[in-house]
Structures are given as C-alpha cells and as structure tokens.
Amino acid sequence: MLTWKNNLTPVSEQFDDIYFSPENGLEETKHVFIKGNDLYNRWRNWNIQNAFCILELGFGTGLNFLTTWKEYLEYKDRFRLHFISIEKFPLNREEISKALSIFSELVEIKKEFLSSYQDLIPGMNYFQFLGGKIHFSLFLGDVSSALCEISGKVDAIFLDGFAPSKNPEMWDKSVLENLKYVSKKGTTLSTFTVARMVRDSLSFSGFKLEKRPGFGRKREMLIGSYSDSFLESNPKEKPWCKRAYPELQIKTVAIVGAGIAGTTLAYSLSRRGIQVFLIDPSGIAKETSGIPMAISHPHLTKIPGPISLFTLRAFRYALSFLSSFADQNFFEKTGLFHSVTQEMDSERLQKGIENHKLSEEIVFWKPIASKFQNGDFLENEPGVFFRNGFWTRPESIAKKCAEQPGVEFIKGTASRIEQDGTSWKLLIQESGHEIVANSIIFCNSHSIGKLIASLFEGEEPFPIRKVRGQLISLKETEKSSRISNILCAEHYLTPSILGEHILGSTFDEFDLNPLPQKKDTDRLLEFVQNKYPSLNFDSSCVLIEKVGLRAQTPDRLPILGPVFDPREFRKIYKEIDLPKNRNKKFPNLKTIQGLYVFGGLGSRGILSSFLGSEIMASLILGEPVPVESSVLEYLHPARFLYRKVRK
C-alpha cells in the first residue's frame, strides 16, 4: 500500500519508508549505483559479445532500472545489458507510472517499460527491450529464495531495499552471504547504507568494502568488490546439473535442424553477434513445424510443478516476443477458452489458478450459466479463459527468424561430427562440405541423438519418441464465423482466419503413418459436431488434412542443455542416492565442451521455443539464464539418466 509525500514521493505504508530521495531520486541512483559501481568507465571498455549483468535487490518503482537503461543508451551499440531484479511486493502499473512521473527524462523509457509490464507471475518474469539490447529478469518473491534460483554470475550488484531498520529480512546475514553464489572476481556492489551488520555480512562473503560520500543528506554510502577468484556454486544445485562455463569466446555455431526450435535459436544467437550455420535437409520448417497454425496457452496443473512452471514462463515471454516480432497475419492474441474435461477437471483448473497465484490479467474461471465473449454459445460451458491465448503460423515465424543477418541456411544432411581442437567439424552429406564451428547444437526433432551416439559407442542418451498428430482445416459456417476465441477441450478449434478454421489434433504413439487417415478426420469431425453442434460442421467443410510427427520426451518437457557422456554419468552417479552417500560430495558433471541439444518440444513447440532459445543462448555464452535454476534442472538433458540410476 502506498501513500504519497507531498503528492510526489511514494512511501511504503508496510515499511514506513520512502522509495527514493525526495531531493532527486534519479541523481541519487546515478550517484549510489551507477557511479558507485563505476559503470561509465567499465562500459567504455566492455567486451562486445557478453552482456553486462546487474543484479538488484529491491525493484520498487523501477527507478534504478529505468535510470540504468537511460545511461546505457550511449553504449547500446557496444554490448547488451541484462538487468535482474528481485521484488517481493511489486507495485502495479498505475503506481509505478505516478511514482516516476516527476522524472521528465524517463518519459519515453517509462512508456516502453510499462507497455510490457503485465501478465506477471510469481518467480521469474523475462522481458526484452530496445530491440533485444536490454534483457530484464524480474523475480517476484522472497529475496532469500530468489538468490538461490539465479543461475549465472553478475558483474554489478545494487543493494536497494528499504533501510535495514525498516526491512531487516532483506538485509539478513544469510541473504547477503548468498551474494557470493552470483559473484565472480571483479563483481562490484554498492548501497546507500553503511550499517555495521551489512558490512560484516558482505565482508564475510568475500567482498572488499570501502565507504564513500553518500548522496544528499546521507553522509556515507558503501561500495565493494568481490575478491575471491574461486567461483562459488549454489549448494542447492545438484552436481549433475551444475553449469559449466565456456572456456573460449563463441563466434560460430552450427545448428542441426531448421524447425521452430532451430530457427528461433538461430535468431537468438545471431542477435548476440554469433555467426550461425543453420542446417536441414528439407528446408525451413518443412516437417512438423510446417503446420498451418499452432495455438498456445500455459498448461495448468493443480499444484505448481515442472510443466506448469515452465509453460507459464514460456507463455508470457512468447507473448512479449511475438507482439513486437510477428506480422499481424501470422500471430494474434484472440484469447483461449479451455472447457472442463475429464483430464482438466474443474477442481484442477480452479485450484491451479489459486495455487499458482495467477491474476485475472492472465486467466480466470468461468462458471456454468455465465455469459461469455461468444454470446450465449458457451453460456453453459464451465472452464478457464486465458485472456492472451494466441495462434501463430509457425512456418512464417521460422522463416522470418532464419532471415536475420548472421544466419546462413545450408540445405543438406549433417552426417558426421568430430572434434577439431577447440572447435567441431560437421560434414554435410550431399556436398561433402565441412563446416567448422565453436559449437554444434542439435535441434533435429526425434533424430536429436543419432549423430551424438557416434561419440558414445552408439548409445543415444535422450529418450525421445515419435507421436503422430493429425489436424484438419474446416471451411467456416455462418455460425462458426462469429467465434472470436480459440476453443479447447479434448481437441481445439481456432477462430476463422480468412474463412478457415483449424481443428486439431490427434495424439497417437503407435500408428506413425505419415499420411492423413480418414479415421482421424472422422474422429475430429465427430468431436466438433458433438461438442459444438450449433456450428453445423460436416464432412463437406473439410479443406485440408495435415500430419506431423512430434518429438516428445517422457515428461513432456523439452531437452535443453549440454551434451554429456552417459557412460561417465553412470560411473560417477550410480550410487548418488544411497543412504550411505547422503553426505558424500560428488563431482560436477563434466559436459562435452561445445555440444548442446534443444529438442523434444512435443506439441508445445511454439510455446517452448522462444524462451528455450534464450535459455540456450545464455548457457552457451555463460550468462545468467532467464529462468530459475530449479526450472533449468527440469529441462536438463541428463535428468532422465539421473532418474534411471536412482532406481
């Protein structure tokens, strides 16, 4: 709850403290945090490839972030900026807008920021601004939990919670000591307070501290630098999924597979200044990614779990990305209504909203006998409505991603890989041409493990299976043309786009026939006729039939991360969960430098690919990733073998 001092300066009623100096909050930020971390001098000499990463404890009104954004503009052509902030009690758009209204210098930046400051979820929320030059990760939650969830090291730290006497939880000894897990030699910090307990905790964590003149009426402030050359790893991370940082600068990457995973990854890497070779024998999005239309919404579970946590994060970033990237004719936020079904029963859906603490801005429950966007059509249909559920045309998005500068498409089959010093060679079967790159990333659907297996005596370490899906398109009827939202139940129906609906999709793990089958078309028609009889669809409405073979993992989450030797994994971790080894320290998993996989997206290719590509790009460059470390563990390529050795 906010009050306003002189109707200008925001004051927290909960902590009885001001958010920024009433004298000049913007100049205070520059003095304490920008100059306190020597950012102007450091930015002038920064590496052009790696993002400069700042961690802030206490987002508040966003003043520090927007001021940093403004000061960074002079350097935006030299490097990217990644700003991570933690906030337990976030302000809404109106409160932030009013709080920052006194700073005329920030008007345009504030406008761009607030246009994306929506659909927030507990935990990590990832944004990009300034055409991908600025990455922003906002963690909503407790600071002690958040620090254990940041995967990566930062370059500077802004400590800006309310005063220690007002908000002791943020300045707790354990919180400040955990800063070592996100620090590396040369990481700096600054803060407005010089309280003794703060200095003692930071010194204990490995920071060399120095007092400096404070801002305005504050006599002193504190700056520091992390002096330990040893990289502390988060003790909560399991040894088999601890990150390995690149030993060399990455300049070239070969991506095998030009579906939606490969093309979105090519886009993410090329925007970081990396030369990308994109390889596929069929062309861009010519296999399963070539479906005419895909729909996306988060997957709600009754209690927060791996699938719901990942898909919520992926959904909100996909919305943000596509809103600025996609042309109007291949992306639209129509909203999506999901009816109650046997699998998605009313308790699961309602408890899912409650337990994930989702606002009505994201999703709300529609009870029976209530009106809806489509008039009386769904009046007696209970379910949930995702306000920004959307449809896309995957092939169009994939092609636009592949057209970016720095992406070279090569039509051909990757037939052999071998290490060449610090690089990798990849042979193109048709031409005999060899591609040399610092890294190879396998995004080739259900063939993801085939080339890798040659390194491990033929063993494919990733359990990906084919799942057949068939969809059909339907000519609109007079009544169906009025539907404005995507409708989901056991199958889904899109609104009419240019006179055509998409009705999908079947799910078959056993019949892998690549050709359309009448029985599947009949099954889909039977569904839509029984579920929505008033729409008057019949067999004469069928326009096209399309089949795709999804690449799916046993837990229906993508495989994303470094390649490892499964033989070594079994040797090292085969007894990791035995009671006798409870206190034993196991070595970190040694991954194969320069080899990565990104696949197994299943039926959520569009939903997963945009955030997945950003995660992968961050891993390859050794930067903080835009999801929690616990979510990263859900996606790790070694998770299946870990589960197997535990049995």
From Swiss-Prot:
Q: Which residues cross the membrane?
A: none
Record region (FAD-dependent cmnm(5)s(2)U34 oxidoreductase): 256-647
Name the domain of life this protein comes from: Bacteria
Location(s), subcellular: Cytoplasm
Its needed co-factors are: FAD
Q: GO:BP terms for this protein?
A: methylation; tRNA wobble base modification
Q: Which reaction does it catalyse?
A: 5-aminomethyl-2-thiouridine(34) in tRNA + S-adenosyl-L-methionine = 5-methylaminomethyl-2-thiouridine(34) in tRNA + S-adenosyl-L-homocysteine + H(+)
Query: What terms describe the molecular function in GO for this protein?
Result: flavin adenine dinucleotide binding; oxidoreductase activity, acting on the CH-NH group of donors; tRNA (5-methylaminomethyl-2-thiouridylate)(34)-methyltransferase activity
Q: Where is this region: tRNA (mnm(5)s(2)U34)-methyltransferase?
A: 1-227
- Give the UniProt entry's GO cellular component terms: cytoplasm
Quote the Pfam families the UniProt record gives: DAO, Methyltransf_30
Quick check: keyword Methyltransferase in the entry? yes
Keywords for the protein's UniProt record, in alphabetical order: Cytoplasm, FAD, Flavoprotein, Methyltransferase, Multifunctional enzyme, Oxidoreductase, S-adenosyl-L-methionine, Transferase, tRNA processing
EC code(s) of this entry:
2.1.1.61, 1.5.-.-
Reply yes or no: does the keyword Aminoacyl-tRNA synthetase apply.
no
Q: What does the similarity note say?
A: In the N-terminal section; belongs to the methyltransferase superfamily. tRNA (mnm(5)s(2)U34)-methyltransferase family.
What biological function has been recorded for the protein in this entry?
Catalyzes the last two steps in the biosynthesis of 5-methylaminomethyl-2-thiouridine (mnm(5)s(2)U) at the wobble position (U34) in tRNA. Catalyzes the FAD-dependent demodification of cmnm(5)s(2)U34 to nm(5)s(2)U34, followed by the transfer of a methyl group from S-adenosyl-L-methionine to nm(5)s(2)U34, to form mnm(5)s(2)U34.
Give the matching PANTHER family.
SARCOSINE DEHYDROGENASE-RELATED (PTHR13847), TRNA 5-METHYLAMINOMETHYL-2-THIOURIDINE BIOSYNTHESIS BIFUNCTIONAL PROTEIN MNMC (PTHR13847:SF283)
Q: What is this protein called?
A: tRNA 5-methylaminomethyl-2-thiouridine biosynthesis bifunctional protein MnmC
Please give the organism: Leptospira interrogans serogroup Icterohaemorrhagiae serovar copenhageni (strain Fiocruz L1-130)
